[in-house]
Amino acid sequence: LCDYKNQTLTEELMGTGIIVCGLNGSGKSTLGKALAKKLHFHFIDNEDLYFPKTDPDYIYASPRTRKEVEKLLWSEIRAHENFVFTSVKGDYGETIYPFFQYAVLIGVPRDIRLQRVRNRSFQKFGERMQIGGDLYEQEEKFFDFVKSRPENAVEEWVQSLKCPILRIDGTKPVEENINYIMEQIQN
């Protein structure tokens, strides 16, 4: 029995929750969306919870607070018993951990991850994120944040989970990784 602010959830209500985690640029969202589609599970992306996309010119404007995100995440989990959740870490308190039946930890070399993050930014914002662009400073601060994250941060966090941890190589094709995950969760 798990009580979260007068919202009682019992194990009988739990379906299958899978957290896909890894550092920025590891391919969490891409893999998570594809995995959710393959399993016919609900997809929850931490980035979507944090950023309500109220400003069409800059999707990262007006981020929600961690408390708001936690409340939204609980709402999503209650509404969808089978889900794939993507996040760098799912560290929203130990009360959520029992809802993860599997954790998928994506590993990608740092240089590849950092390049992916820059490429993604350019795909979203184009010249606006380049020198002289109106988003240059904001995006550079984000890149510095991504670079500053300890390489072992997610590995250390995932050790606190009680579910099986599936480690995958995020440089491999998405379909290959999905096939591996499917084999592991069906056994």
Ranges and model annotations:
Residues 20:
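Hydrophobic anchor at the beta1->P-loop junction of P-loop NTPases
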Residues 15-17, 81:
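Pre-Walker A (Motif I) flank of P-loop NTPase domains
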Residues 99-120:
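Conserved phosphate-donor/acceptor-positioning beta-strand/loop module used by diverse small-molecule
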Residues 26:
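ATP-binding Walker
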Residues 126-177:
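Small-molecule kinase domains that catalyze NTP-dependent phosphoryl transfer to phosphate-bearing small molecules
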Residues 23:
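P-loop (Walker A) phosphate-binding loop of NTP-binding proteins
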Residues 33, 37-75:
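Conserved substrate/cofactor phosphate-moiety recognition/catalytic segment
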Residues 29:
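Walker A/P-loop
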